[in-house]
């Protein structure tokens, strides 16, 4: 991370990071294992499970400030994807898809990425750059309408799932 931030400080550029973990809490030990997409003990299924941990976003922010970089976020993955048009993308793909199996797959992928009880709210997005860039999804103007937009996102999410379920 420090190498990346040093490079951005020296040469410009930016980094957009998506990862999972809380933003406000101080992390203790978040080591966990996943076997076939389900949580399990880190001692179960040796060499077959993925061992992972939650990212400490506060630490990333602290390191970015050491390099005097601009830090935007966090916002949820759901907010980012809806702000940049996942609902329109899914809708357009659903219109072009004739196969029931493809529609089920599209529904499953959309739900997995945006579900507020899953990756949609668990995964966070931060943007770090040398120069201040105004990215609409991260702007303060966007923040003050958070509740309105969040309600719209939740409504859109449910509406899209309903449309896709009707098709399949």
Predicted features along the sequence, with ranges:
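Long, Lys/Arg- and hydrophobic-enriched amphipathic alpha-helices
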Residues: 1-168
């Amino acid at each position: 991370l420090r190498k990346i931030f040093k490079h951005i400080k020296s040469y410009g550029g930016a980094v957009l990071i998506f990862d999972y973990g809380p933003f406000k809490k101080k992390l203790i030990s978040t080591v966990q294992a996943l076997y076939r997409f389900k949580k399990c003990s880190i001692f179960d299924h040796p060499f077959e499970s993925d061992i992972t941990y939650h990212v400490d976003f506060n630490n990333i922010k602290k390191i970015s400030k050491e390099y005097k970089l601009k830090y935007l976020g966090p916002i949820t993955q759901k907010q980012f994807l809806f702000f940049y048009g996942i609902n329109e993308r899914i809708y357009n793909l659903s219109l072009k898809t004739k196969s029931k199996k493809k529609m089920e797959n599209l529904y499953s992928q959309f739900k997995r990425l945006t579900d507020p009880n899953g990756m949609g709210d668990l995964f966070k997005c931060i943007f770090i750059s040398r120069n201040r860039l105004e990215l609409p999804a991260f702007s303060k103007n966007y923040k003050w309408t958070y509740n309105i937009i969040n309600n719209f996102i939740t409504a859109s999410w449910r509406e899209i799932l309903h449309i896709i379920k009707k098709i399949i």
